[in-house]
């Protein structure tokens, strides 16, 4: 069972999981076998797989593979506890992305309820495996809905433009999800509809997800695209080359504040200054209503080597020995800089009354 996109970060069939090692792209395409939750944890932490939706699916499936042939001796309640603890462990691999913790919570609730009526531990694992597999299928469908909603909305908002050029950041395509993509899914939909002039992508330092992954996907699918340095984005907007910026999200607070790849905040400020529309594109699982604002979002800090060495820390040292490093993986873009939030349920726009997002009000009827 796998997504149908030509580029697949996750290749799964029951009892087997292979993850595309995205650290080696675009020069090599190598898949790594994942046979346990420990393998999954390491793959997520080491960024073999990345992207908020993808890591949630990869984590869930890693545990599904582990329990598919597990010789477990215990009651249904003990099996549910085993699954729950493994999921807690997997969540610790990357704390900023809410998709992972959201998926874990849903799966924990599911197996706990199943344990109330299950006759043996094997049936608990079966329930878990089927639920994890459903998440994989649903993610692709949700991504395509995001792309469709986003493309239609952008065309309405930019009706005066015969064709639309957009800028995107990091990687939000089929490599960051189970298939198709979120922000890159919108770009795909615009291209399929014949209204995309060009997609610009940032290199996205220090791990270069834009130059290594997004550029790779765009070239692979023959979408007209241009790669720019992160520091060239403001100049690009000033010269009028883009009408919109579209980014993904790792966590969206109740007020619309959005945590995404470091550098997103810079782009939002530049977009506001140059009157360029700024869109966040993400599944509703990226929304965390328990957080009133982005101030409460935990920001992961990564290894200094990503800045000290070339190739996002994988190459030779390029910085002076002894220099201190601050390397946050994400930043938080305030809601007032965001034009709208594109989800699989539709587009969340700001209220006329005070210009804020009523995300809770949007989600209640959508569920």
Curated annotation (Swiss-Prot):
Transmembrane segments: none annotated. It comes from the Eukaryota. GO terms for cellular component: cytoplasm; nucleus. One of its GO terms (molecular function) is S-methyl-5-thioribose-1-phosphate isomerase activity. The keyword Amino-acid biosynthesis applies. Its EC number is 5.3.1.23. Keywords: Amino-acid biosynthesis, Cytoplasm, Isomerase, Methionine biosynthesis, Nucleus. The record marks 170 as: Transition state stabilizer. It is an enzyme of class 5 (isomerase). InterPro entries: IF-2B-related, IF-M1Pi, IF_2B-like_C, Initiation_fac_2B_a/b/d, M1Pi_N, NagB/RpiA_transferase-like. Pathway: Amino-acid biosynthesis; L-methionine biosynthesis via salvage pathway; L-methionine from S-methyl-5-thio-alpha-D-ribose 1-phosphate: step 1/6. It is found in: Cytoplasm; Nucleus. The active site is at 250 (proton donor). SUPFAM superfamilies: NagB/RpiA/CoA transferase-like. Pfam families: IF-2B (PF01008). One of its GO terms (biological process) is L-methionine salvage from methylthioadenosine. Its main location: cytoplasm. It catalyses: 5-(methylsulfanyl)-alpha-D-ribose 1-phosphate = 5-(methylsulfanyl)-D-ribulose 1-phosphate. Catalyzes the interconversion of methylthioribose-1-phosphate (MTR-1-P) into methylthioribulose-1-phosphate (MTRu-1-P). HAMAP family: Salvage_MtnA (MF_01678). NCBIfam families: eIF-2B_rel, PRK05720.1, salvage_mtnA. Belongs to the eIF-2B alpha/beta/delta subunits family. MtnA subfamily. This is Methylthioribose-1-phosphate isomerase. It comes from Zea mays (Maize).
